[in-house]
Amino acid sequence: MILGTRDIIEQIQRGNVPDGYKKTKAGILPADWDVHMLGECLSRVERPVEVKPNELYTQIGIRSHGKGIFYKEPVTGAALGNKSVFWIEPDCFIVNIVFAWEQAIGKTTQSEVGMIGSHRFPMYRPVNDRVDIDYLISYFLTKRGTDILEAASPGGAGRNKTLGQERFLKSKIVLPPIEEQKKIAAILTTQDRVIELKEKRLAEKQRQKKYLMQQLLTGKKRLPGFSGEWKANRLRNIATRHTKRNTIGNTNVLTISAQYGLINQAEFFNKAVASDDKSNYFLLEKGDFAYNKSYSNGYPFGAIKRLTRYEVGIVSPLYICFRIKEGSVSGEYLEQYFEAGLMSHEIQAFAQEGARNHGLLNIAIDDFFNSKILLPSLEEQTAIAEVLSAADREIELLRQDIEQEKQKKKALMQLLLTGIVRVKI
């Protein structure tokens, strides 16, 4: 009887051994899969560099989470000093022993020949065609593989948690026949390329939107049908400070995220981190704005976000909150204006350089509300916001598509690297 994927999964979950499988210490595996020590499959490769002071050398680095190799700026041998470095050999498994527990692994190629790597980046070449490097990298990104890297990296977090190479090579790994390894690796590599192409498309859409923002929100480019004068308005003329406290016991605690805006804190951090007493928090309604005065990536002078996800929520009293005056400005336009960073130069002008309290910019409320904002007519604001919102929707759909492709890859890894689904050779 030929079993389907669901039948195999159900049998394995019940502890039964399906036809064509066997029970091992590593779990239930296909009958032709074996368990090997890594030392039986890999051999260390090293060729020391005789560093010459006047020569230029390009060093590699290894990103965490299986993101692979990157190149550093060339340096002279004199700048390397007494560092112990090695020539990069092609077609090897390479690992950063300091961050192996974070899956800082990769595969060397012909592109890296002539470059050098730290003594902390040991390289290994397959022995007797027992293991495919691409398969091995995918394996180390699974739960079973990361467990091996962590177990071989004892100690505390950070630089004290270093991979013990002897322990690493004594670790046991599950391997299908080499041809099946290569086929599995090819399938996963194809899926990686799908993700990579869509991520490039997303980056291009984001660049296009940024260009549109810079053109439309400054009046450099006008939409058809609009030619009216733009005027500078102070924030206090179009919005009022919002300080309503949470007297109703609302528990939807919000935080500001660069990508998601005002989002539920527990959802964003996967845990509740706010204090128990939330009565002094500000109570926001949909459409209200909040300004986080702390620096974050991409927001050197803090981020201003609009509440769009929920009807109501609460934020820390450290935020500056405000509500637009009805009929004075488009909330959607203002949201795009702040996202473009066009308020930053205003904040920079009155924020004291280096004056931060617990990471927060020292900003006076009056100064903040005296900030100037360039505004066209309400009709043109609405039209601009519609164009930029349409671009946002395209970007969000692409993000969702990419996330689905990543989930698809996870499912493929779970099925292919455990032998639940077999590939045809």
Residue spans for each PLM region:
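DNA target-recognition patches
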Residues: 18, 39-43, 47-81, 123, ...
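Non-catalytic DNA-recognition/assembly elements of restriction-modification systems
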Residues: 19-49, 170, 178, 223-246
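Amphipathic alpha-helical coiled-coil/heptad-repeat segments
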Residues: 1-28, 32, 175-231, 374-425
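A short glycine-rich beta-alpha junction/loop motif
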Residues: 18-22, 101, 115-120, 155-179, ...
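A short beta-sheet element
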Residues: 84-145, 164, 282-343, 356-357, ...
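Short, solvent-exposed loop/turn positions at domain surfaces
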Residues: 23, 79-82, 157, 190, ...
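Residue-level recognition of short, solvent-exposed, well-ordered loop/turn junctions
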Residues: 34, 71, 77, 83, ...
